[in-house]
Amino acid sequence: MTEELKSAIERAAAALKAFGAREVYVFGSAATGTMDEYSDVDLAVSGLPPEVFYRAMGKAGDILQRPLDLVDLDDDNPFIRYLKEEKELVRVA
């Protein structure tokens, strides 16, 4: 991951926290170091109020300037459980 992208992820995480997220994590290729120029950025949040989720996602995407996959860790579904159980999450903020 380039320093520029790392900085953008940190700024996106700060924006998500400004919208009310308690915690922000990165996962996927950005977390494992296998990201390339075509990769999206996978972020996970907890505590982000549902009424601002998509607005916050748009702001983070604008900062990143690449596709963003934002997941809510407060949801209870198999994918979220997998991320938590397999320790796939790297805390950003």
Residue ranges and their predicted role:
Residues 1-23, 31-37, 48-93:
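Catalytic core of pol beta-like nucleotidyltransferases
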Residues 44-46:
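Short hydrophobic/aromatic beta-strand micro-patches
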